[in-house]
A protein has these predicted regions:
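Transmembrane-helix signature of polytopic, membrane-embedded enzymes
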Residues: 11, 98-126, 161
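Extracytoplasmic catalytic/substrate-binding loops of multi-pass membrane glycan-assembly enzymes
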Residues: 28-44, 51-70, 78, 82
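Membrane-interface alpha helices of multi-pass inner-membrane proteins
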Residues: 128, 150, 162-178, 184-189, ...
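Short acidic/glycine- and proline-prone juxtamembrane loop motifs at membrane-interface regions
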Residues: 132-141
């Protein structure tokens, strides 16, 4: 490779690293959603004295252990919650930055330097929900990637401490996302497949997981008692239908995926025709062209959703999800080009991602195509076979593998740079930023003008209508859970998830915890017009028991008298 070519490659890599850093800085200020608010509110409840798995019925509450510590530190330093969102966002970026450094040191031992850089850039840029805060989805990604790295390291170097660390990482995955028990099973399968002493290593792995689970369960029983703990678990399973799949909604979940499958099928047919007609002369050039067709079709579909349709819900995740599919397909077709060590790393990442996919699918209300966005470990290791698809540069100027990987990584960096996950839980382009939140926990977060204005109005009216420390219930279809923090309110709902359920289960909750019955109820409205079904059980109960109503701009406040 010539000196000028080497300098050119270094410049391209520097561009990607700078872009990845800028994306994370952008993400600190711009990518804050209702899921971010939910993570903050869960930690806030812990700090306010609500007992986990007793008074709290959030499905992901066990993931709050990192956020609770960080928010405790923040409160001790500042004495309030203003700017707390920014603090947690910065902490999340720093944690992933440190993890990226660790991953780089691991992959560098077995892979070429430029390939290692590309893999780590993907890890630094991609998130399941494209938000930087240390919340359950990011924790699941972080611990699963570390777990797969520890497993691969054990399979290669045979150091037993790595097997123990891998088991502990899987336990942390379960704390982050309870259904990640499925991931533990997949990891155990990897141990059986790769280990030379299969029985011994399986029992070591399973023993560490079982012992860790027993210790944590003992802690919960000690805090809550066996009867109360079992009752709470039963309540959690039956109280929140926002994360439960219903038969009638199966079509909604899979119809989104079907459109993507049609595009992929068209790509496969086109690729097969071109190869069959011998449009391309060599096998390697065919692989390269097949890859190009897949990626172009994927890119076109993503841009169609982002820019023609004006966003697709969690569009940034969707775009990443769709692009990951051809990466996995093409890499699997070219696995034979890899060394045995590379195959071990690849299969560990792919198998971990399969476990992640099923773990999330069990406990999510996302469309299936978005769940693929959790398969970031697969995207990372897919670069290994892709690196070998195109031969190195020769005298005729054949495209080098770095060019292919550069385009892939550049797409992800560019997409994460120009798209933001907005405060209102929508996806928009960075040009949609018009203002900044100036009060409350989200102070300092960039947003649209309406998001800024509505937050300002809500905080002002909260100060007028709600006394500090009162029991508060916020009712709406998409609740910003940080609203409970405006006046240090005690949460009167069993869950602060943004898609909380409002039904008769609340009466059971208040019956068990009378001190949680609301003093004031805030119902989403639009200048006096309620934005919640007035014929619902919740509104009928409010009107019967909380007849005194005061209308605000975006919330109506109800009191008993």
């Amino acid at each position: 490779m010539s000196s000028s070519s080497s300098v050119h490659d270094k410049r391209k890599m520097l561009i990607l690293w700078i872009g990845a850093v800028l994306v994370n800085i952008k993400s600190i200020f711009c990518d804050f959603t209702l899921d971010s608010a939910y993570a903050m509110a869960t930690s806030y409840r812990n700090l306010s004295g609500d007992k986990m798995l007793l008074q709290m019925w959030e499905p992901h509450q066990t993931s709050a252990f990192i956020g609770t510590v960080l928010m405790k530190i923040f409160y001790l330093l500042t004495g309030g919650w203003d700017f707390s969102a920014l603090f947690l966002q910065i902490a999340g970026v720093l944690v992933f930055g440190i993890a990226t450094f660790f991953l780089h040191s691991f992959f560098r031992q077995y892979l070429p330097r430029d390939l290692t850089d590309y893999i780590c850039i993907l890890f630094l840029v991609l998130r399941p929900k494209q938000i930087p805060m240390i919340e359950f989805s990011n924790m699941l990604l972080l611990f699963s990637v570390l777990g797969s790295v520890f497993l691969a390291s054990y399979f290669i170097k045979k150091k037993r401490v790595m097997l123990v660390l891998a088991a502990l990482m899987d336990c942390l995955c379960v704390l982050s996302y309870p259904s990640a028990v499925v991931l533990c099973l997949f990891s155990a399968g990897l141990v059986i497949y790769f280990s030379e002493e299969k029985a011994r290593d399986f029992f070591i792995f399973a023993g560490v997981c079982a012992l860790s689970g027993a210790v944590y369960l003992s802690y919960l029983i000690f805090r809550s008692g066996t009867a109360d703990l079992m009752l709470t678990v039963k309540s959690i399973m039956g109280s929140d239908d926002s994360h439960m799949r219903m038969i009638q909604s199966v079509y909604d979940y899979w119809s989104d995926t079907l459109r993507g499958v049609i595009i992929l099928a068209a790509g496969i047919v086109l690729c097969c025709l071109l190869v069959r007609l011998k449009v391309l002369k060599t096998r390697d050039s065919r692989y390269a062209f097949v890859s190009a067709v897949f990626f172009v079709l994927s890119l076109a579909y993503c841009f169609y959703n982002e820019f023609v349709k004006g966003g697709y819900g969690s569009s940034c995740s969707f775009a990443a999800s769709f692009f990951i599919i051809p990466m996995i397909v093409i890499s699997a077709l070219n696995l034979s080009k890899c060394s045995e060590t590379e195959k071990c790393i690849y299969l560990t990442g792919i198998w971990t991602s399969a476990g992640l996919f099923l773990s999330v699918l069990v406990l999510t209300n996302l469309p299936v195509i978005n769940v693929i966005g959790y398969m970031i470990p697969a995207a990372m290791v897919s670069l290994i076979p892709l690196y070998h698809i195109v031969p190195a540069a020769d005298s005729e100027g054949t495209m080098r593998p770095a060019a292919t990987l550069f385009v892939i990584c550049f797409f992800f960096v560019l997409g994460r740079g120009i798209l933001i996950q907005a405060y209102s839980d929508s996806t928009t382009m960075i040009t949609g930023i018009e203002n900044v939140v100036r009060k409350g926990p989200a102070k300092g977060i960039f947003c649209s003008y309406m998001e800024y204005y509505m937050t300002e109005c809500n905080i002002r009216e909260w100060d007028e209508q709600i006394r500090e420390g009162e029991n508060l219930l916020v009712v709406g279809y998409a609740v910003d859970s940080t609203e409970y923090m405006y006046r240090d309110s005690s949460v009167s709902h069993y869950s602060t998830i943004n898609t909380a359920t409002f039904n008769e289960t609340l009466l059971d909750y208040w019956g068990r915890f009378p001190d949680k019955r609301p003093d004031v109820i805030a119902v989403a409205c639009w200048y006096g017009e309620l934005k919640y079904d007035e014929d619902s059980w919740m509104m009928q109960w409010i009107e019967e028991n909380y007849p005194v109503r005061t209308d605000g701009s975006y919330f109506a406040f109800f009191r008993a008298g």
